[in-house]
Amino acid sequence: MLEHLRATDPIIADLIEREAQRQRQGLELIASENYTSLAVMEAQGSVLTNKYAEGLPGRRYYGGCEFVDAIEQLAIDRACQLFGTSHANVQPHSGAQANIAVFTALLQPGDTILGMRLDHGGHLTHGSPVNFSGKWYNVHFYGVDPQTGQIDYDDLAAKARAIRPKLITSGASAYPRLIDFARMRQIADEVGALLMADIAHIAGLVATGEHPSPVGHAHIITTTTHKTLRGPRGGLILMGEEFAKQINSSVFPGTQGGPLMHVIAGKAVAFGEALRPEFKQYAAQIRRNAKALAEGLHAQGLTLVSGGTDNHLMLVDLRSTGLTGAQAQRALDKAAITVNKNAIPDDPQPPMKTSGIRIGTPAVTTRGMREREMAQIAAWIGEVLMYPDDEVRLARIAAEVAEMCRHFPVPADMVQVR
């Protein structure tokens, strides 16, 4: 493996090998990360990286597109089948690019949007002032109820009536509960707004019925193709006939040039994998593992925002431990447990410190771990957070983590295991 790269650029080859070792020997609990299959990686590493294909299948600006046309059409058809929509655009390079395309298709600069507060679990592209969405549009925010930690739909409705937004965004990057897309569509209809559902984190759960679907409620749906969907890093837009032409034009030529055909091939492979019965079993296990991990963390005396989880992630409020999210992240890194610092609702700490950490189960579930392993992981996390400066203890836990991981190979190692 990597023999050509090692001969051409041994420095990069060595860094890739070291990253592979990190993934192999550590627990990946970042909620937005996962492991793609070898098939997806092979598609991404193929000769398709050499091909330009501006336009859509059958309507290209370049010759020689007969095979990439077939690949992209397969990706489109499989995405529509997977989510139950009539139209899909598989070209966005990322979830952020998908959101940019939707905003530029449906809005004019200065239009009003209503999105979820970033520190309440939303996403940068839903109106954060440091993002294009917060710079180009008049943004107002909704959030979670301080008592329950869950979306306050009554407050959302009141704000929508007051500001009459042109677009309401639903979806989040750090929200552990189910989203009521039907209620959000009712609110949108009441004020004449469009509803965009960003399901980047929960797409794999939505596709398998493990989370209510926004299809039939949202006018437009965006997502990434990695995370719980377990494909390559990229974006996807789902819609009906009403918005298809606008969205397609907004992706190209509006916000992008040539699509990444090697990534689109990887998306097609991942969508095909997600259509198989075993993927439904995988998605169900993600939620079971998340529930077990949340219960284990609670048993360790840790506080969870909203009290638990309904999906693939949980948010730990660290204020009772005296640690910031950044401190907890560093200590867990030393124990070979990877999480990310994350804001909690109304967080008093700045974004690079935070008062919380976000934890998710998609990657460890891909490795085959189940509820028993979640109980052990919770115990390790509890111990690290209790003794974050005990280097000997952290090294011991890292060794124990590596031993557990040895029994649950990442996809890149499965060929050797077989």
Swiss-Prot record:
Pathway: One-carbon metabolism; tetrahydrofolate interconversion; Amino-acid biosynthesis; glycine biosynthesis; glycine from L-serine: step 1/1. The gene is glyA. GO terms for molecular function: glycine hydroxymethyltransferase activity; pyridoxal phosphate binding. Disulfide bonds: none annotated. Belongs to the SHMT family. Pfam families: SHMT. PANTHER family: SERINE HYDROXYMETHYLTRANSFERASE, SERINE HYDROXYMETHYLTRANSFERASE 1. It catalyses: (6R)-5,10-methylene-5,6,7,8-tetrahydrofolate + glycine + H2O = (6S)-5,6,7,8-tetrahydrofolate + L-serine. This is Serine hydroxymethyltransferase. Its cofactor is pyridoxal 5'-phosphate. GO terms for biological process: glycine biosynthetic process from serine; tetrahydrofolate interconversion.
